[in-house]
């Protein structure tokens, strides 16, 4: 960890980095439709599933739920990455787990990761949708009663939606920001 990851520049990033100290800019937003529904029962389980850059909105929702609302509802976060170095905020989520017994963080790495092993970081090798199914949903009493919030690459979203559909989860319980399409 540490350092920067080289990524292709986006329109906004290019604009921001072209500014000079003292330049005035106007910012608005964020605008989007990825948010928790109002009036959910306090006991309804929330399952967050993220991958790649999907960490940012997931973290925002989870910080609000636990640091602002101090929610007591059952919540889990299943995050998939290629390697530990591509999984930010792991320590932060473990700290929330310690403070809130109703929260579980689960890290899925695509393959065994020597760096994670050396650091003693707990993870499950595999794709996040398979890890979620094998380690939780296949034995869940009522997966159709949970609310699922996802943000990540299109292939991840499609795999999770198919799995949830196969489990009989109604589409209104599946919320996602498909930023890759």
Regions found by a protein language model. Name each.
Residues 42-44, 67-75:
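Conserved S-adenosyl-L-methionine
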Residues 57-69:
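Histidine-anchored nucleotide/phosphate-binding helix
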Residues 1-23, 81-83, 108-112:
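Ferredoxin-reductase
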Residues 73-181:
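Reductase modules of NAD(P)H-dependent flavoproteins
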Residues 32-40:
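Short, Lys/Arg- and Gly-enriched loop/turn segments at beta-strand edges
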Residues 35, 57-60, 159-160:
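Phosphate- and divalent-cation-binding pockets in alpha/beta enzyme and binding domains
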Residues 45-49, 147-149:
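Conserved beta-strand elements of the Class I
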């Amino acid at each position: 960890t540490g350092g920067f990851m080289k990524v292709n520049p986006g329109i906004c990033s290019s604009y921001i980095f072209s500014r000079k100290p003292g330049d005035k800019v106007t910012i608005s937003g964020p605008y989007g439709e990825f948010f928790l529904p109002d009036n959910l029962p306090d006991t309804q389980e929330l399952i967050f599933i993220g991958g790649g850059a999907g960490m940012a909105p997931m973290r925002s929702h989870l910080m609000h739920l636990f640091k602002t609302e101090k929610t007591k509802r059952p919540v889990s976060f299943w995050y998939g990455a290629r390697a530990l170095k591509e999984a930010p905020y792991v320590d932060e989520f473990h700290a929330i787990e310690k403070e809130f017994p109703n929260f579980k963080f689960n890290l899925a790495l695509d393959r065994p990761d020597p760096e994670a092993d050396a650091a003693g970081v707990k993870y499950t090798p595999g794709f996040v949708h398979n890890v979620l199914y094998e380690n939780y949903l296949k034995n869940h009493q009522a997966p159709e009663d949970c609310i699922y919030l996802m943000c990540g690459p299109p292939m991840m979203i499609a795999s999770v939606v198919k799995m949830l559909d196969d489990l009989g989860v109604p589409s209104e319980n599946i919320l996602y920001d498909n930023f890759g399409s």
